[in-house]
């Protein structure tokens, strides 16, 4: 379980746990440094993606926005339908690297649709996934070390694997048909959106607004 993982590995962060789930073991310091550098290098979007995809017809639902971004990446991949393990790993590493931008930009596009100001920041290669999310999320790009640590821990606790919940089970079902990575992950996001799964978080936001 997650608590055992934290006790045994001295609180591995998001990047360490990502490596573990992909390759079956926690990385050494050298492997972790190389992995972080690779993730940072891949944390980019195609030219004009923000203009052509993110800012055009933003949805009132952020998960719908993210699903659209994922599926749009199919268009930019010359080997989108190649489901060999090396290619799927490449695609997944790209998506893992890009998800902080997808999440934050979906939030900003959603707020822009509601008439609020828009600001889009590029990720910083020296920052972790959690730090980049906080930096890109806020207008002043400021955050504390404690905030980054808490978010990093939250990202680890939310990392799903195996297939016990609806969205991870969806990936097993959809990928078994032999479809591409982008369609599979988009299907999982569609499942996550449901009010009996990740969509339940929307009710928490509504509760805060009511308060």
Predicted feature residues:
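Hydrophobic alpha-helical bundle cores within soluble ligand-binding/oligomerization subdomains
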Residues: 1-211
């Amino acid at each position: 379980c997650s608590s055992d993982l934290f006790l045994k590995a001295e609180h591995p962060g998001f990047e360490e746990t990502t490596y573990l789930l992909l390759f079956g073991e926690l990385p050494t310091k050298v492997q972790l440094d190389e992995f972080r550098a690779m993730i940072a290098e891949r944390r980019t979007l195609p030219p004009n993606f923000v203009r052509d995809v993110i800012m055009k017809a933003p949805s009132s639902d952020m998960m719908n926005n993210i699903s659209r971004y994922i599926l749009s990446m199919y268009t930019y991949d010359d080997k989108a339908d190649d489901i060999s393990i090396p290619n799927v790993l490449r695609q997944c590493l790209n998506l893992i690297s890009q998800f902080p931008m997808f999440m934050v930009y979906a939030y900003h596009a959603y707020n822009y649709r509601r008439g609020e100001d828009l600001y889009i920041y590029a990720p910083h290669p020296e920052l972790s996934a959690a730090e980049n999310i906080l930096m890109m999320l806020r207008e002043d790009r400021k955050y504390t070390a404690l905030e980054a640590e808490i978010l990093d821990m939250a990202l680890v606790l939310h990392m799903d694997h195996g297939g016990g919940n609806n969205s991870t089970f969806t990936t097993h079902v959809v990928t078994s048909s032999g479809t591409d990575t982008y369609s599979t992950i988009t299907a999982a996001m569609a499942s996550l959106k449901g009010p009996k799964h990740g969509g339940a978080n929307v009710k928490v936001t509504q509760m805060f607004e009511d308060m």
